[in-house]
Amino acid sequence: MVDPVPEEEKEGAEPGGSEGDEATASEPPDAQGAQQPAASSASASAAAPRKAEVPCGAEGGRREQSPLLHLDLFNFACPEAEGSRYVLTSPRSLEACARCAVKPVELLPRALADLVREAPGRSMRVATGLYEAYEAERLAKLQQCRAERERIMREEKRRLFTPKGPAAAPASASASASASALSGGSSSSCSSSSSLPASPASRVARRTSPSPPARSRPPPAGSRTGRKSHSLDSLSRRRDGALSSESGASSSSYSGESLRELRWPPRASARNSCPAGSASSAPNPLGRPSALALVPLTARSFSLGDLSHSPQTAQHVERIVRQVRAERGLRGVPERDRKIAALMLARHQEERLLLEQRAAAHGQWEQQRVRAEQRREREEREKQRALERGRRAWAAQVEERRGRRGREEREAARRRQQQCERSEERRRELAERQGLLRRERVERAARDDRLRKLQQEQNLKQREEGRQEGRERAELVRRERAQRAARARERQEGQLQREKRELSRAERARHEALLRGRVRQQQEEREGLRSSLEASLGRAQENYEQLQEQRARELRERARREELQGRRAKEAAERKEREHQAHLEALARAGERRLQHAAQVAEEAVQQKARRVVQTRLEKERAQRANKEKVERDEDCRRRELLQAIGRKLERSEQLSRERRSALESARSTARASFHVREKVREETNTRSFDRMVREAQLHASLDRK
């Protein structure tokens, strides 16, 4: 739940900017978005410390930012955090959830597809009912946590605006009493939430706290500036009291939890009452001084530059440089290589401390993961048992429905068989009477037409009545279904089953009505079709005879027209041939005239082109002679200049080679000294394998050859 800053706090309650419990981001309680994956949590944790820096920088020069304060952007640099399905949230929201005994993950919305995927045997209607029940429960919990969070915000504002002096003592006493009551009342919620895997940022925050009693020391209740001081002097005093002579600075394990402890000590002590939230009580299996003991409550992480500039690191580097000078007899080591050696030593110290912290945190995380696995297994077993019960009930209902449907189908098949037998009997009778009824075809056709019209009108009337009845029944079923759905949201699973039975009964009645209407319609259509076919057969025979006579007349008329068109086409073709021959003769005469004119023009063009070619050749010969003389003169000048430049380059190259040899000797000496210093640092910080020793021997041999 995101913790927005109220208008009163923006105006004067906390002048340091937005509060520190915006240090982490999460799914808001009043937002209905989907659950964030671990990658979004990681990005939120990377962006959250930047929010935590805002109060220090928003003072406008009243308080100087400490250059020793650094943020830890590697809260999720572990394999366990990659698959985490939990999100970070603000301290107010966490405290509200703890007071209401609600896990933060229960406030996240779940998609309907997740419920269907978890129980593949359930029908979509059952999954929808479960989803609605889950959403109603989630919204109720969300409203409860939201109200509790508003109550916490009012308590904080009341505590912030409490006047200093004697009147502040009762307020501080009541605040401590409420904090102790909160810690006692939320012990069950702490125990329940401890079974869940904690988010990586909160895990790192708990890892940095040395002991639970150290976190329960709040500053004076009336001094807000004491809780928010981040000056250089206070940070220096904290660092001097926290760091020993062996470790020049603590590792980069910043967490927003320590910043929250400085600003909200009552809530920090309430959270400390949960025994599963501290990792400092875990034993150190390696037998080395634990990194958790090096970071007290008010300590801050320091950069690699702070570690490299510590006096112990500088003395260590000086000792290595003196040792290399004494052993190798080389010149002094440059300042840059001294800094590199100091950084190597500082990085080794930082990695060692970070490994110890991660080992302790991983042990705590593994315990919480095992507890979460056990809880998930129990829930899965309960879910499977409920699923098996639902599956058995569903199988019994399906079997009962299948038997009922089989009986209905057998009854319908028997009725269809009887109807088919009756229709077959009528067809045989009609076939026997067909010879007798052929003479009365005209009268029967008229009578059949009248009967068919009457039957069609009756069919239309019955069909419209059936449709109206179906619509009324469907509307009735829809209203009943809406009423049952409204009642089902108020009642439980029993009423859902009754609704299903009523729905299936209504559907069965509608299905039977549709079947009866369809059978009656098919019967009527079959009788009407038979009578219409007999009438259309007689009309078709008469039409066929008329068509035969008409087709013979059309064929005779078409033959006469085609003969007339053939004579006309032959005359037109002869006339067109004569015109074409005359046109070809005219074209031949015009082509001869054009050829004579073109030959004359081509002869004149050839003579003119020959004259131009002779003149162009003479001009090119004169230009070639002039260019040849100019090229010879330029070549002589270039040759003389090239000889002079070669002489100057030879002199310059000899001078540069002498300077290069002297600089190379100096650089090799410095490189040997730097190399030996770094090797000394590596020998003290790293373990040497056989392959590393072989490579070092080869490198020494190549340096000695140089």
Curated annotation (Swiss-Prot):
Pfam families reported for this sequence: DUF4659
Coiled coil where? Answer: 360-624
Q: Does the keyword NAD apply?
A: no
**Which Cys-Cys disulphide bridges does the record give?**
none
Q: Which residues carry this modification: Phosphoserine?
A: S310
Give yes or no: UniProt keyword Coiled coil.
yes
Which keywords appear in this protein's UniProt record, sorted alphabetically? Coiled coil, Phosphoprotein
| Range of residues in the leader sequence | none
Acidic residues composition-biased segments: 1-11
Compositionally biased region (Basic and acidic residues): 368-386, 448-529, 548-580, 651-663, 676-706
Q: Where is the composition biased (Pro residues)?
A: 210-221
Supply the InterPro entries for this chain.
DUF4659
Where are the stretches annotated Disordered? 1-63, 179-262, 268-287, 364-386, 398-425, 448-580, 651-706
Task: List the biased-composition ranges (Low complexity).
Answer: 28-49, 179-209, 242-257, 664-674
For this protein, the record's PANTHER family field holds: COILED-COIL DOMAIN-CONTAINING PROTEIN 177 (PTHR33663:SF1)
The protein in question is named: Coiled-coil domain-containing protein 177
